[in-house]
Amino acid sequence: LVLISLLLIFVALSVVWKRRRGTIVLVTGAVFWMLGSVLPGPLVRLANDHYTAINDPRFGSRMAIVVLGGGTSYDHQRRLVPKGDAMTRIDLAASLYKRCVETEKSCFVIVSGGNPQHHEQSEADLYGSLLLDAGVKRADLILENESLDTYENARNTEKILRSRQYDRLLLITSSLHMRRAMLAFDAFGLHPQPTVAYVRPPLTWWLPRRKGWFDSNSALHELVGIARFYVWRWIGLY
């Protein structure tokens, strides 16, 4: 978590600079106060970039719909479920697939997501079962269940698409994740049409809230990931 890493940095600074410990504590408190109150909105707005609305994608005659994993978690009954807003990605993919089939177009769905949280199922396997329940045909569903990050999402999806014919590629993820995902997919020669499933609203408060820290952490995670992409690109890893 980005905020935990930031806190550890402040703790390390207070240990190294003992004479400045009081100042560091005050600065730490002020920074985390703002991260829970006034900064979530601007950070989310920056991470969202221009992906601020759920768009209606253009269809082709041969459609490839890629759904990126957004994590898994256990509900109060200890059932494994999509984490956070990930269910919106599944719902949107099922809806677009249905529209595609109704217009008698050729379409298939790729779900890309491994098991970085070490749960009983990968993201792709769990999401895939829900897409089957929503009406996606098994023959039109491809599960890519090895990716552990956005880089691997793009790399492994590109490998799958090499042997597939398509004239339109849709990429489904959240507004926060879309900018980083598009950078990764473009780097692998894929130029998908961004299709936002959920827009994170840029909310701000005067007093710190748990949701404020959550939003700040999510936005900073994406912004750090974007910065890392450009560093990796510069040194030739992408």
Predicted regions and their residues:
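Membrane-interface elements of multi-pass transporters and channels
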Residues: 19, 46-54, 234-238
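A structural signal for short, hydrophobic/glycine-enriched beta-strand patches
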Residues: 37-213
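C-terminal functional extensions of proteins
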Residues: 221-225
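Hydrophobic membrane-insertion alpha-helices, especially the h-region
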Residues: 22-38
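Membrane-embedded alpha-helical segments of integral membrane proteins
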Residues: 1-15
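Short, aromatic-rich membrane-interface segments at the entry and exit
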Residues: 2-4, 19-25
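Extracytoplasmic/luminal low-complexity segments enriched in Pro/Gly and acidic/polar residues
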Residues: 216, 227-238
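Structural signal for the C-terminal ends of transmembrane alpha-helices
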Residues: 12-19, 35-36
